[in-house]
Amino acid sequence: TYNDLYLDLRQRLRKAGVEAAQLEARELICHASGKSQEEFLKDSRLYAPSPVEEQLAVDVQRRLAGEPVAYIIGEWNFYGLPLTVTPAVLIPRPDTEIIAARAIELAKAAGPHGRVLDLCTGSGCIGLAVAKHAENCRVVLGDLSEDALRVCRQNARQNGLTARTTILTVDALQLPTHFLGDFNV
């Protein structure tokens, strides 16, 4: 059953020293099965079809080889936003949500014409969280990596935030080649 798969996988991950074995086992099974967490819980007594078990075996080997679960499943949740993640960007961490919360406060305090700069944006997690929760501001997200910018653009699109964001190539160690304007945050 799905529950048996979960219990076995959780145990394997714990033996391998994975701290968040419970969370990661559930995430990997949901990914392999295409189920939400709610569907996984509801269907826990059902038997998983062979293709799900085969995909799970591949995913588990990747995890046991040290690949982060977020890269295996290709997405991670940050401040209520589902974000695509690839090895081209850092995985959003829960402690970074503290920075996002403060940036949101500052952006809201800046008023309806506030401007926010998210430099070295990677996945765009901080800037996109600001754009989502401080709706009257404009956010400029910049990175030097074109691969990271592709991920950031995809995240802006999938979260419906392209109208309030500008995503561009910026080298944090160089003066900008074009005038970016003033920023409140």
Sequence positions of predicted segments:
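Short, solvent-exposed loop/helix junctions and linker helices
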Residues: 3, 15, 22, 49-53, ...
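A general structural signal for well-ordered alpha-helical segments in protein cores
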Residues: 6, 25-26, 53-56, 69, ...
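Non-catalytic accessory regions of SAM-dependent methyltransferases
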Residues: 1-41, 45-48
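Conserved SAM/SAH cofactor-binding pocket of Class I
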Residues: 97-185
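Amphipathic alpha-helical regulatory segments at dimerization interfaces
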Residues: 11-15, 62, 155
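Histidine kinase transmitter module recognition
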Residues: 16, 32, 88, 158-159, ...
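Conserved AdoMet
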Residues: 29-105
